Amino acid sequence: CNKIISGEIRASLIVGGEARYKKLRALIEDKEFYETELNINPDHYVKAKDDLHIKEEEDHLGLMAVGYYAILESALRANKKLSIDEHKEYLGKMYSKFSKIAASNPDGWLQQDYKWQDIAISNSKNPIQALPYNKLHCTSWNVNQASAMILCSDELANTLNIPLSKRIYPLASSETNHMIATIQRPNLIEPLGLKLAAEYILDICSKNNIEPNTYELYSCFPVAVQMFSKALKIKDGKDLTVTGGMSFAGGPLNSYMIHSTVKMLKEIRENNHKIGLVTGVSGMMTKQAFALWAKEPLIDFSHKDVTKDAEELEKPIKISELKKGKGRIIGYTVLPKNKTDNEKAIIYIEDTNGDRKVLISYDKNILKNMGEEEWVGKLINFKDKYLA
């Protein structure tokens, strides 16, 4: 947007797509799948200077995101003081509402209206992925979906005779690219970059008497939705998606925010009074972004990258060097048995020095109890990498 405003470029085409469902079907049907390699970077490329996770996290949680987000979810559940059963129902009802929206979305991938119990209760069709998340809590990236949008100046739109009815205006955006491994974040559920980027948008809205009334909160996993909702101070009862969310509408990898933005622009075209706020995430709730849209150019567009501010104020917590000792659990999950490992718990703790450590447990009684009562906040003993 800033490049268009400055005259550096006249227009930009933003495209995203995913054909993973086609790839999946080719595998199932033993057919060849042809994939075109992308060997060049986009014009604007932000390369991460830090890793998404530390070695201990990768060793026990792997590279899939679900375990990391499940640990964040446990921390948020404890912060909200919800019991295990209350939390199951809360997430089930939130995502049941999402499924209803996806069912009426002509572009939605799963157009089925689920009851909250269908989502909350694990079974063969909705297996546990990482406690407390079942399959229907998780983003669905096995989709065939594509989307595109064009950004240009009013001057070019006039030259091309683009009808006013089709024009939507970006009002403001913000982002943070500050990276801290999940376990090293001072506050697991309130990262500073998220707070600063959200505050920038909220301040613009407050100063200009703009009130967002339509939301699309990034929904790779339920904890992301809740963290965005809290940061934006959204009142209970508001719809938090226009697509139906990534579990049901579809979650094409690396391009969902384009899809969700296009859907938001359609919503604003159909109802000119809507002011839309779209959010995005990268990594393990590592980076966040916000974009504010409206039918009219209510204010001059502005953007802020809060990365440097966040880097200066939020530092990673040290990893514990203790081989044996006591600690307090700050988050946990239980991963189901897979091809390479048995069912196990992955536990984040803070030791008596205030440093962080990743622990594991294979104790079946502990694993069972972790799904029945809250373990966040418990004082525990450890030896090496194991819960003692």
Across the structure, where does each feature detected by a protein language model lie?
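Conserved "HGTGT" condensation-loop signature of ketosynthase/thiolase-family condensing enzymes
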Residues: 2-156, 162-249, 266, 280-282, ...
